[in-house]
Amino acid sequence: MKTKSILSYKTTKIRYRKNNKTFVKLFLGIIAASLFSGCEPKDVFEEENTIIPPTGQKVVRVEPDDGVTKVNSLTKAIKENGDGIYELERGGIYYLEGKNVISSNVTIRATYGSGSLPTIQPLSDEQGALNSDMLRFEGNATFENIYFNGKDAASNSIMQRLFRLDKKNLSLRFEGCFVENCRNFCIRTDNSGSKVYIDNSTFRNFALTSDPANGRLFDSRGNAPDTISITNSTVYNLTGQIIRFDGAVAKHVEVKNNTFYNVGYHFRIDYAMTAYIENNIFANVGWKAGYDASSPSAFWDLKELEKSDSYDPKDIRIYIRNNNIYTDQEIKALYVKYPGNIERVPLNSVAQAMIDDGRLVYEKNISEVLKFDGAPALPMAYIEKFFEVLKKGMSPWADLPFYVDENGKDGFTNDETFTFRYPVSSTSATASTTNGPLGAPMWNQ
């Protein structure tokens, strides 16, 4: 179901013809003129609320690409000008061809105004080669009001990875952005000390249907991050994990006021020294089952940290409170139909021990099934096949649909998008730590 909203995107499929660049240029010219609008509440984009940079900061206006005579205009401008603010034209498209590394400290944002969002999108080269990563970072980066589409503009192939942090202690921030389409992971850290912030944004469609262990929002790859912060955002349609700690110790984790919908993996914490997980909706998150009835797996899957020179497990403080975690009946029925799948219990024994010794506060969490006004349909054919085959793998059924969009075309059109509003009469509408609504604030206005 889809409903009218203030959110609007539009993209057009482009098929690259190696021997006919005039054809490609024509269509890329058309798409460059298409309008892209934001997925965030309207006030994010209004002129009166646009932040003007302080005097003295370098501001570089970058003209859009046409995909034929101009590509990589953004990264070329950064290499030429270094640290600064880079403004992208609203409605413009900025193509990334080949390997693109940002080594400077930059803010990349939409130009002043309330028009449609600029788009950053990969474009394969004349030989059809598509880089594995959209952007790699050796400097700090902030993105404000940008639409990222991880689908190749020429072939419609979906990228493996979108964003990689290559050096230590880097900061990556998304504010008011819409990010979609990748197979393995959206954000990956290849070094320690990273700080990743997602605020007032939408992230969706991260899935490798042949191997659904992939499809992650954040993946530490075992490199200890300083901060992971996801706030006021909507995340949906992932085969993998929201956060993959992968045995790395995060100093600070903040997951507050978000709406999560259709995520295959449960929430495993291995490890976090301080974590606040509160005021969220987890709708159909963690439908990948456990398989041992004698020792059921947990949704909140905490692991005990061993003491070391760097970390003392006695210092851990985790707060999981005022969240709504539920599974729709059509998924619940699969645990009965395919009894080799065991539905997850809320907490494991490690979590219970941490409650007993005061390191974990677990309170005021509810399980209330909500009816969203315009959420995408669950990909039940894919999910049911996953239940049916147990641990045999999904490669033979990788073509079953999982990715979603509003109208069968890439992106958003007709001022419509999926929405996640729910009745104000729901318990969730007053269940937050401040007695307000749970979930992303954009759906409660």
Regions found by a protein language model. Name each.
Residues 1-3, 9-12, 17-20, 24, ...:
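Generic cytosolic/nucleocytoplasmic N-terminal low-complexity/intrinsically disordered segments
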Residues 2-19, 26-29, 33-61:
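Bacterial Sec-dependent N-terminal signal peptides
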Residues 7, 66-68:
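Compositionally biased, intrinsically disordered low-complexity regions
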Residues 27-30, 81, 412-415:
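Short, ordered beta-strand-loop transition motifs
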Residues 45-53, 75, 94-430, 441-445:
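Extracellular beta-rich repeat passengers
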Residues 59-65, 75-96, 106-113, 438:
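Glycine-rich repeat segments that build the extracellular carbohydrate-interaction surface of secreted
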Residues 70-73:
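Well-ordered alpha-helical segments embedded in enzymatic catalytic cores
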Residues 435:
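Glycine-rich, aromatic-lined ligand/substrate-binding cores of catalytic
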